[in-house]
């Protein structure tokens, strides 16, 4: 297949056309008065969204050269979303502005490599300024960050703040679709894993179909238990103590399961058996977690512990265990707090070291089960389309609040970048690098201009008014159409989101500026279809 090669100014202009098409579609969504974008879907109804990265991911242009430009800016949005969870529209606007001004400078004779160096230096300085503006999250700020990120939906902001309060910053918060029209929060105390009872005969609360064990012993075993004679001495000791028993094992089957069921029905021993969570090495690690949480010794052949030698003091304890057909929840395990703290530190270290996203997610789940708990936000809406859009907003808001807890917050509404640009006014470098600094300074005004433009006001006037005020938190609140202290008004952004948006935008824009040639396939010209019956051409009107 023959390729086309486009050089220098023609290549940069082709990229710019692609960048503009994508950015112009994305930037209408910015701010509290941003508009929606409707996306056609091959299957099902169209999707309506105000999420920048969702819009960016849908865009595929016909011209292969322009499409390359669009895809590179799409990368800015995706990367910012992955790292910070929000700020995708801001990042797209910054990338468009830096690249557009850069192309003009290169066309006027500036050296692209010097421009890129200037841009990189300016971004480094601006990022430091953003960090100086940052304040740690306190009080109602979590709800405010969630509200802003969910496109000014206070209900979502408050639910996320409640969830964070209940499970702590290490807890796992998941988002699910609700069967009702109401968005609500469910929290699970203690450790829960997705394995239910092995026999419905273990149920003690018939109405709720749950087995509830108060103050039970917990036997943790990594292999199958099928032979009764290994288990019998232990069962006799437990029956004498009058306490219930939870068995967690790879499988409990045959006569072992039958004996437990018969004793349960006779009232001799209140027991329940569940399968061990996870698979392979992850199962071993999770059983060790349960052991540490409950103060029990997991029975594993690797460490030379066998079932027949187990005594009562080797078993774990908990205040209460609830088992339904799908889940087991252990509340208030009797493990040593120092041991649990040590395990939490170990898991945090593993999370920092791992390079696999899947492993990180699983480690974070284990950490949450030991440290905080699990909260589930159930998103409800009147229609399927609205629910999908709302669920995406909740997920964005959740990422943004986590980012805020991690690195703090800065004034929102595009003000943090405008204040950071102030430091660039006195920053001096040599030659064409200075043009690069000016490009970043101009780009830092762009998000505020766009927020103002989307709310139907003139951007330049607002930018000047905000810039002149000495108070760093002073800005334009587009939701109420007033000038005020944005932090006090709850218009705040996570520092990580603002910082990531600028860094990723400058990184990709700098690469595009230093492009000198583009290679793409030549689009095939489709041959005209043959004439229809009777010699009429395909476009004959009759």
Swiss-Prot record:
The GO terms describing molecular function are: ATP binding; ATP-dependent protein folding chaperone; isomerase activity; unfolded protein binding
Q: What EC number(s) would the UniProt record show? A: 5.6.1.7
Q: Which residues bind ATP?
A: 29-32, 50, 86-90, 413, 477-479, 493
Q: Which SUPFAM superfamilies match?
A: GroEL apical domain-like, GroEL equatorial domain-like, GroEL-intermediate domain like
Q: Which domain of life is it from?
A: Bacteria
Principal localization reads cytoplasm
What is one Gene Ontology biological process annotated in the Swiss-Prot or TrEMBL record? protein refolding
Q: Cross-referenced HAMAP family, in alphabetical order? A: CH60 (MF_00600)
What does the subunit section of this Swiss-Prot or TrEMBL entry state? Answer: Forms a cylinder of 14 subunits composed of two heptameric rings stacked back-to-back. Interacts with the co-chaperonin GroES.
Q: State the protein's name.
A: Chaperonin GroEL
Which species does the entry assign this protein to?
A: Solibacter usitatus (strain Ellin6076)
């Amino acid at each position: 297949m023959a390729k086309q090669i486009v050089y220098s100014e023609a290549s940069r202009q082709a990229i710019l056309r692609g960048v503009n098409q994508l950015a112009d579609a994305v930037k209408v969504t910015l701010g509290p008065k941003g508009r929606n974008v409707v996306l056609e879907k091959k299957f099902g109804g169209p999707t309506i969204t105000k999420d920048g990265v969702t819009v960016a991911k849908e865009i595929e242009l016909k011209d292969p050269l322009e499409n390359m430009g669009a895809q590179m800016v799409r990368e800015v949005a995706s990367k910012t979303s992955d790292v910070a969870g929000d700020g995708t529209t801001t990042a797209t606007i910054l990338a468009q502005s830096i690249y557009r001004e850069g192309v003009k400078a290169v066309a006027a004779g500036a050296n692209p490599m010097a421009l890129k160096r200037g841009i990189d230096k300016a971004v480094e300085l601006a990022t430091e300024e953003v960090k100086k503006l940052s304040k740690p999250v306190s009080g109602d700020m979590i709800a405010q960050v969630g509200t802003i990120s969910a496109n000014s939906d206070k209900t979502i902001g408050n639910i996320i703040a409640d969830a964070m309060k209940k499970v702590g910053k290490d807890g796992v918060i998941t988002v699910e679709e609700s069967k009702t029209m109401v968005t609500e929060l469910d929290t699970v105390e203690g450790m829960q894993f997705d394995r239910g009872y092995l026999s419905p005969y273990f149920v003690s609360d018939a109405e709720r179909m749950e087995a509830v064990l108060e103050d039970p012993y917990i036997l943790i075993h990594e292999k199958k238990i099928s032979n009764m004679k290994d288990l019998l001495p232990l069962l006799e000791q437990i029956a004498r103590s009058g306490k219930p028993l939870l068995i967690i094992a790879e499988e409990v089957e045959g006569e072992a399961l039958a004996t437990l069921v018969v004793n349960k029905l006779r009232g001799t021993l209140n027991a329940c058996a569940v399968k061990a969570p996870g698979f392979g090495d992850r199962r071993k690690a999770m059983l060790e977690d349960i052991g540490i949480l409950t103060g029990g010794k997991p029975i594993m052949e690797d460490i030379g512990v066998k079932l027949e030698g187990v005594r009562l003091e080797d078993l774990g304890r908990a205040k209460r265990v609830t088992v339904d057909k799908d889940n087991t929840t252990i509340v208030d395990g009797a493990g040593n707090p120092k041991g649990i703290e040590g395990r939490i530190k170990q898991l945090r270290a593993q999370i920092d070291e791992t390079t696999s996203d899947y492993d990180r997610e699983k480690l974070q789940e284990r950490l949450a089960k030991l440290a905080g708990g699990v909260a589930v936000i159930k998103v409800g809406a009147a229609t399927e389309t609205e629910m999908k859009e709302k669920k995406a907003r909740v997920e964005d808001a959740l990422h943004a609040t986590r980012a805020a807890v991690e690195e703090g917050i800065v004034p929102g509404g595009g003000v943090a970048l405008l204040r950071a640009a102030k430091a660039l006014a006195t920053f001096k470098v040599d030659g064409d690098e200075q043009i690069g600094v000016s490009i970043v300074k101009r780009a830092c005004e762009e998000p505020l201009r766009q927020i103002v433009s989307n709310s139907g006001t003139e951007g330049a006037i607002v930018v000047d008014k905000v810039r002149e005020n000495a108070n760093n938190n002073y800005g334009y609140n587009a939701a109420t159409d007033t000038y005020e202290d944005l932090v006090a008004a709850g218009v705040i952004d996570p520092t990580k989101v603002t910082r990531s948006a600028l860094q990723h935008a400058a990184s990709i824009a700098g690469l595009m500026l230093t492009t000198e040639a583009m290679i793409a396939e030549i689009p095939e010209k489709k041959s005209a279809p043959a004439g229809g019956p009777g010699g009429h051409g395909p476009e004959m009107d009759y």
